């Protein structure tokens, strides 16, 4: 198996956000205390209730072509991710930078096309992509913002280490899942 850190074959490494190997991380301390007071059967019941509610009100995503139920529940954990103020500031800077870069890419693709002409990206990957909209060529939206909401999927692999799994400018459904998760 490929490890994230070494790039070599071996055991897949993961990062435990709540524990530092010995103790509960400071950012998770109050959440841990609250959850620790809740009996395991209550936590399991609440998880099952949340999943049933998700299914009943249709908070699912479609996976076509794999057989079985195409409407699957989103992966949901009752335990929220906790970020320190410093972590959140760093993530915010990086996410804003990605949003600017993605909008600059779209501005170029639908405008001057320099990235394709320079050979940085093959033309077929852009112009033959099903998401490419010919009607947008030459259009400049207000403030040059083509995508107002961008879904950026993050994974944490270390204490100060985050990686982007994907950017979604078309239908960032994860935003709606996140908002609904807060309600449930």
What are these regions (language model features)?
Residues 1-184:
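Preference for protein termini
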């Amino acid at each position: 198996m490929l490890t994230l850190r070494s790039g070599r074959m071996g055991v897949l490494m993961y990062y435990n956000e709540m524990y530092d190997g010995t103790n509960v991380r400071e950012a998770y301390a109050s959440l841990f205390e609250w959850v620790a007071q809740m009996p395991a059967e209550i936590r399991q019941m609440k998880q099952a209730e949340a999943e049933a509610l998700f299914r009943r009100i249709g908070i699912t995503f479609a996976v076509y072509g794999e057989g079985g139920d195409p409407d699957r529940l989103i992966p949901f954990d009752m335990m929220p991710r906790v970020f320190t103020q410093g972590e959140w500031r760093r993530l915010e800077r990086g996410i804003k930078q990605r949003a600017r870069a993605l909008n600059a890419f779209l501005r170029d693709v639908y405008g001057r096309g320099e990235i394709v002409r320079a050979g940085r990206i093959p033309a077929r990957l852009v112009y033959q992509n099903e998401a490419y909209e010919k009607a947008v060529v030459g259009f400049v939206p207000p403030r040059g913002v083509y995508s107002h909401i961008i879904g950026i999927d993050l994974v944490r692999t270390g204490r100060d280490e985050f990686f982007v799994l994907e950017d979604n400018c078309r239908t960032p459904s994860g935003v709606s899942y996140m908002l609904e998760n807060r309600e449930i």
